[in-house]
Structures are given as C-alpha cells and as structure tokens.
C-alpha cells in the first residue's frame, strides 16, 4: 500500500509542483526529472537512477551513497593506518564537571527553531536558511563562551543551496576527532513541496552535538588549544540525498591529507517509545556493521562510564548515515542511534516527525556519551597507537 501511495503522489508531481511554485515562489526548487545520478547501494554495487527513482528507493527502505561527484572517494587511502583506541576512560573528573553544563532546555529551544523551517530539504531555500541559522547559532555559542580567539566556525559550500557547517577547536596537533550530525530533513513523498520538520531525523542529532559543543567550550584547556588533538563538529547538508555533504567534506579531507583519527555520527537521538512498548530497557543503539570495530568498542566503554542507560548492539546496513562517508574515505568511524534499529522512530521522512514524540532525557544521554567520547579522544595520545594496514 505504501508503494501505491508513493506512486500516486509521484504521478501528481508536475501539477502539484506548478501550483507550489506559483504559491511559494520564495522556495523555488528547480526540478530536473531526466538528470541521472550514480548511486552505490552496497560496496562496489552501482547503478544510474533519476532523482524520482532515488526517492522511490528510499521509500522502499533502500539506502545508498550518491557517488556522482565522488566516484573515487577513498582511493588514495587504501593502505591507511589502522588506529588503536583507548582501552578505558581516564578523564572522569573533567567530563563530570563539563557534563554539568549540558541542558535539556537548550536542546529543546534549538530544536523548536530548527523544526520551524517548512523543510530543510537541501535543494531548497528553506534548506539554505536553516543552514544559515545553524552557522549563526554555532558562532553565537563560540561568542558566548568567549572563545573567538581560538575556536571558529565556517560554511562548507556545495553545488546545491544548503551548506554544511564545520566548527573547529584547534589542538596541539593536526590529528582530528570529528563529531557529526546531518542538519537536513526530507519528506520522501514530495521532497520539494511537503513539510519535513525532521525533529528526530536529524534535528535531534543536530541539537545534541550543538549542546555538546557548547558544554565542551566550558573547558579552558580545550578553548586554549591544550588538547593534544584538534576537535571538529560537523553539521552535514544533504545526507538524505545520499550522504552528499559528508562525502564532499571527506573527499576534501582525503585530497588534502587530513589526519582524521575518529568520527562519530549522531543521527536520531530522541525516540524511545517503541523500545519501551516492546518491553525493552531504554538504551542507546551502537551500530556494528560498516563501522570501525576499535572505535565502536571504545564507544561501548564510554557509554558504560558516562551514561545512565546501557548500550545495545544493532545494525543499520550500508550507507545508513554520514559515518559511511568517513569510512569510505579511509577514516575510522562509528554511529550511535537512539535504540535498536528495529525500534527507531517510525515518523521520519514525513510531516509527522515532530518534537512531541521525542525524549529530551534520552537526548541528554546521547549528549553525555558524545561529550565523554570527544573529551577522552581529544586528550588521547594517538602518536604511538597506529599500525600500518599493509602489515596486517
């Protein structure tokens, strides 16, 4: 039945689009129905599709990377080093102090603003406006922390309207720890027209890492650049289009020889109801497929140390979020989601992905985990912790 409804909506697209452009000229989206895109649905498995076919695949549960502009991502890092991660947490006192700064009210206020945009579809003017707001908010956080002399945020532009946002906290080396979330949203039943509040997907991750960024800047050592490693926070554009924004960024990093030691993606951090309805304990879902096993193991340790709820292993398939872009570029990456994948939010990609379904207490647990991870790894000495994959 879902497929029939989607097909009917797709058939009505030309007429509806014309009406939409007439009544909402402020958000014109130029449709190119015949343009082809190269997608990868599994490692090495590619096909050419139209944009409508991309959305049909997504409606039917198929994830993919759109590699039209990034066909060689990772090709120069095939013999990259394998990174070793800590065996235990050692920064408990510092993280405990910083965690006191995490505030649910900030996440709620930021999410209310983020969901006020009609959509955050990456090809729309709304998507541009929402990314402008993300950059503005991140810069305000830096200013409020008095960190402007060392910490900075900038736009990473793309060939579509919405830009990505990168905040950088320089450390004593160029070795970098990345925390990511995607800022765009989509309504898979008519992306250029219908509302897509995207509260959980991925407004929740966006504001979770935004709050972690704010809390982290309460550390004078971090702001003063005393951490051994550089720390970056990424808010990606166009994840819903096939991980487009994150691929562009990690392709740029690969080409410039950036030393990324770890990347954690936070995509959907707020929904717990299906878990509770199934009689399962509230937990965070640690993804175990298509991720770096060493980083993933350490994340479990971080959850046990800094969260009030346990972790549960789960899988989400190929290219299920932006960590896949980092992984393909040859960088260690991991993904933590709100629950076991089968209990994740059923409202996403529709007009009903709203704040009312989310738990800010649960989002706070994700924030605690993320803060613990970024502080532990930010102050970790990676210099003696790598081995060449070619020797394995």
From Swiss-Prot:
Q: Which CDD domains match?
A: M28_AAP
The protein's name: Leucine aminopeptidase 1
Q: Where is it localised?
A: Secreted
Query: Is Nucleotidyltransferase one of the keywords UniProt gives this record?
Result: no
Binding positions for Zn(2+) 1 per the UniProt entry: 182, 201, 267
Q: Which GO terms describe its molecular function?
A: aminopeptidase activity; metal ion binding; metalloexopeptidase activity
Give a short account of what the protein does: Extracellular aminopeptidase that allows assimilation of proteinaceous substrates.
- Per UniProt, the enzyme's principal EC class comes to hydrolase
Give the GO terms filed under biological process for this record: proteolysis
From the UniProt record, report the name of the gene that encodes this protein: LAP1
| Cofactors demanded by this protein | Zn(2+)
Keyword terms, alphabetized: Aminopeptidase, Disulfide bond, Glycoprotein, Hydrolase, Metal-binding, Protease, Secreted, Signal, Zinc, Zymogen
Q: Please list the residues that bind Zn(2+) 2.
A: 201, 240, 349
Please give the Gene3D superfamilies that the UniProt record associates with this protein. Answer: Zn peptidases
Instruction: Tell me which PANTHER family the record gives.
Output: AMINOPEPTIDASE YDR415C-RELATED, METALLOPEPTIDASE M28 FAMILY MEMBER
For this chain, the annotated S-S bridges are 316-320
Instruction: List GO terms (cellular component aspect).
Output: extracellular region
């Amino acid at each position: 039945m879902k497929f029939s409804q989607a097909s009917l909506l797709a058939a009505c697209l030309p007429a509806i689009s014309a009406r939409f452009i007439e009544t909402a000229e402020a958000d014109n989206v130029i449709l190119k129905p015949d343009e082809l895109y190269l997608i990868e649905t599994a490692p090495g498995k590619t096909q050419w599709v139209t944009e409508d076919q991309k959305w049909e695949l997504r409606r039917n549960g198929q994830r993919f990377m759109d590699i039209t502009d990034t066909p060689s991502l990772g090709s120069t890092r095939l013999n990259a080093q394998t990174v070793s991660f800590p065996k235990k947490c050692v920064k408990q006192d510092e993280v405990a102090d910083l965690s006191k700064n995490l505030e649910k009210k900030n996440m709620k206020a930021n999410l209310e603003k983020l969901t006020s945009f009609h959509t955050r579809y990456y090809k729309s003017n709304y998507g541009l406006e929402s990314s402008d707001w993300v950059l503005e908010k991140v810069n305000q956080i830096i200013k409020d922390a008095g960190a402007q002399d060392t910490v900075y945020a900038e736009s990473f532009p793309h060939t579509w309207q919405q830009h990505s946002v990168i905040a950088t906290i320089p450390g004593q080396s160029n070795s970098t720890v990345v925390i990511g979330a995607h800022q765009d949203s989509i309504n898979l039943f008519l992306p250029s027209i219908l509302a897509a509040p995207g509260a959980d997907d991925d407004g929740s991750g966006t504001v979770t890492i935004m709050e972690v960024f704010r809390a982290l800047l309460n550390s004078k050592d971090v702001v003063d650049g005393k951490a051994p490693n550089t720390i970056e926070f990424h808010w990606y554009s166009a994840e819903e289009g096939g991980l487009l924004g994150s691929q562009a960024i990690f392709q740029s990093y690969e080409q410039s020889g950036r030393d990324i030691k770890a990347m954690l993606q936070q995509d959907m951090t707020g929904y717990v109801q299906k878990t509770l309805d199934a009689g399962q304990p509230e937990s965070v879902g640690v993804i175990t497929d298509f991720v770096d096993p060493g980083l993933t193991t350490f994340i479990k340790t971080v959850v046990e140390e800094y969260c009030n709820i346990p972790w549960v292993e789960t899988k989400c398939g190929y290219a299920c979020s932006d960590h896949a872009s980092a992984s393909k570029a040859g960088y260690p990456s991991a993904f933590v989601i709100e629950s076991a994948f089968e209990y994740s939010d059923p409202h996403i990609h529709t007009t009903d992905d709203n704040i009312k379904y989310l738990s800010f207490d649960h989002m706070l647990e994700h924030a605690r985990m993320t803060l613990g991870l970024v502080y532990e790894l930010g102050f970790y000495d990676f210099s003696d912790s790598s081995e060449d994959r070619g020797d394995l």
